[in-house]
Design a protein with these regions (language model features):
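Bacterial N-terminal signal peptides
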Residues: 1-7
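Acidic, serine/threonine-rich low-complexity disordered tracts
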Residues: 13-87, 108-197
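Acidic/charged, solvent-exposed loop-and-adjacent secondary-structure segments enriched in E/D, K/R, S/T
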Residues: 85-108
Length: 197
C-alpha cells in the first residue's frame, strides 16, 4: 500500500514532513475502547464515472489485541455499517491509508490511469512536495499537488491540478483533523473529524 511503502523509506538526516503523517503515533492518546468519529463526503461529476457521491460516517475504534493495539474502521453509509479488516502495527491514523487509496481509486476511475503509476506519483509527492503552514494554535496544514509536474498531466484532465490537504493537530483525538482532495469542480473528497468518546 501507498502509506506503508512511504513509511518504510530510508532514514534521512532531517525528518521529512511526511513523518507527521506516517511516523507519528496519532492514536497514542486514544484509550482502548474509545471511538473517534469522522464524516466522509465525496462529490464528483457523474460523467467521470468515479461512482456515487458519498456522505457517510466513519468510526475508528481502538482495542488491545493479542499483538498489541489494533484499530477497527467502520464505514457507515445509509445505516449499512461495514468493517474494514483491523489495522495492526500502524503508527499513524489508518484513515490516512483509507483516504489515500480512495483518492487513487477516484483518479484511476476518472482518467483510466494505472493505479500503480498514480500511487507512485502520490508517494513521490508525499515525500518531496508537501508544504507546511500553521493552523490554529498548534495545528499544521500539509498540502501537495501530486501531478503538478507530472509528464502525463495532459491525460489527467481536472486531476492534473488536484490539491491534497492534510490538517493535523496534536490535541485532536486521532490527530488528523481533516484530509481532502479537490480537482476543481470535477471532484472533491473530504474526511473530517467529528467527535470522540
Amino acid at each position: 500500500m501507498l502509506a506503508m511503502a512511504l513509511a518504510a523509506g530510508g532514514a534521512a538526516a532531517e525528518k521529512p514532513l511526511s513523518d507527521l503523517l506516517f511516523a507519528t503515533p496519532h492514536l497514542a492518546q486514544v484509550a482502548p475502547g474509545e471511538q473517534v468519529r469522522y464524516s466522509h463526503r465525496r462529490v464528483s461529476d457523474p460523467a467521470l464515472n468515479i461512482g456515487p457521491d458519498i456522505d457517510e460516517a466513519i468510526a475508528l475504534r481502538v482495542a488491545e489485541g493479542l499483538g498489541g493495539r489494533e484499530v477497527t474502521v467502520t464505514l457507515d453509509a445509509d445505516g449499512r455499517p461495514r468493517d474494514l479488516d483491523p489495522f495492526r502495527g500502524v503508527p499513524g491514523n489508518p484513515l490516512l491509508m483509507v483516504f489515500l487509496e480512495d483518492t487513487v481509486r477516484a483518479v484511476n476511475r476518472a482518467t483510466g490511469g494505472s493505479p500503480f503509476y498514480l500511487r507512485n506519483r502520490m508517494r513521490d509527492a508525499l515525500r518531496d512536495q508537501l508544504t507546511e503552514a500553521p493552523s490554529g494554535d498548534s495545528g499544521t496544514v500539509l498540502t501537495m499537488q501530486p501531478f503538478d509536474h507530472d509528464a502525463n498531466r495532459a491525460k489527467l484532465g481536472a486531476f492534473a491540478d488536484m490539491r491534497v490537504r492534510f490538517e493535523v493537530a496534536p490535541d485532536a483525538p486521532g490527530m488528523l483533523v481533516a484530509m481532502s482532495a479537490e480537482a476543481g469542480t470535477a471532484y472533491s473528497e473530504e474526511i473530517r473529524l467529528v467527535t470522540s468518546r
